[in-house]
Swiss-Prot record:
Protein name as annotated: Thrombin-like enzyme Cdc SII
Gene Ontology terms, MF aspect: serine-type peptidase activity; toxin activity
Activity-regulation annotation: Strongly inhibited by PMSF and moderately inhibited by leupeptin. Not inhibited by EDTA, aprotinin, pepstatin, and bestatin.
Job description of the protein: Thrombin-like snake venom serine protease that coagulates human plasma and bovine fibrinogen by hydrolysis of the alpha chains (FGA) (minimum coagulation dose is 60 ug on fibrinogen). Has fibrinogenolytic activities, and degrades preferentially the Aalpha chain (FGA). Shows amidolytic activity toward N-benzoyl-L-Arg-p-nitroanilide, has a higher activity than Cdc SI. In vivo, intravenous injection induces defibrin(ogen)ation and a loss of the righting reflex and opisthotoxins, together with a typical gyroxin-like effect (18-20 minutes).
């Protein structure tokens, strides 16, 4: 993907945790 993947992944994991 684009630069700043780690931030995006952390944000994605956080949102996934909310929906799980």
């Amino acid at each position: 993907v684009i630069g700043g993947d780690i931030c995006n992944i952390n944000e994605h994991n956080f949102l996934v945790a909310l929906y799980e």
